[in-house]
């Protein structure tokens, strides 16, 4: 909201990266309640960001995607995992994760390529590959962005940090903001890395200002006490 009000004439995009769709909707609803013009605001998850700004516009530059692709959801991924494990003669119980086995992971990746399908993990991997192999992609994206806000950054993984870093370094006039609490990291088991201020400064080659919120805006003071 501040970025829009600070320069209302700017057509450059203000990016808000959230961890869930619900969080993105909450941002949109709050801005709507404040009567903020949202025409230059984009809010969504990192996977949605990669699809919107990298995969869809630049799929033709990916050997894997240039002849078409289909995105599968987590339900389909789990079904594939079970089918592959069964085909490999593995006897798993209901709670076993077939993807803990390397041979299942290898066959799963082969099947996806054969069927011209990608999952959520592949969205990030291919996005990073495109940014690394085609520098102009990062430059093009960075040229239309004025700011990037990452919410709950403590749950961001290394691949996501890398994607955002590449885009930022293509245009260091972009305003960067990471919001979160390293003490509330809950997705470390899924690869989330709660980087400290110094680590972020090293990765993004920028000096960050650190600000702390002293109050609690989710609970009553009685509950906090």
Regions found by a protein language model. Name each.
Residues 6-9, 36, 139-141, 168-172, ...:
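Conserved catalytic network of the ASCE P-loop NTPase/AAA+ motor domain
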């Amino acid at each position: 909201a501040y970025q829009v009000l600070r320069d209302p004439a700017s057509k450059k995009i203000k990016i808000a990266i959230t961890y869930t769709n619900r969080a993105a909707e909450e941002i949109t609803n709050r801005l709507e309640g404040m009567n903020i013009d949202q025409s230059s605001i984009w809010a969504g998850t990192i996977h949605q960001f990669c699809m919107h700004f990298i995969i869809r516009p630049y799929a033709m530059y990916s050997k894997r995607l240039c002849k078409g692709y289909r995105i599968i959801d987590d339900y389909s991924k789990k079904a594939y995992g079970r089918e592959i494990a069964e085909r490999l003669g593995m006897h798993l119980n209901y709670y076993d994760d077939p993807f803990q086995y390397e041979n299942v992971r290898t066959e799963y990746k082969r099947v996806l390529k054969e069927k011209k399908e990608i999952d959520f993990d592949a969205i990030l991997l291919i996005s990073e590959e495109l940014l690394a192999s085609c520098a102009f992609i990062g430059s093009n994206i960075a040229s239309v962005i004025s700011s990037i806000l990452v919410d709950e950054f403590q749950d961001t993984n290394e691949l996501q940090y890398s994607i955002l870093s590449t885009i930022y370094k293509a245009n260091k006039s972009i305003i960067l903001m990471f919001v979160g609490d390293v003490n509330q990291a809950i997705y470390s088991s899924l690869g989330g890395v709660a980087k400290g201020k110094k680590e972020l400064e090293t990765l993004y080659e920028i000096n960050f200002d650190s600000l702390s919120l002293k109050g609690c805006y989710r609970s009553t003071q009685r509950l906090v006490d």
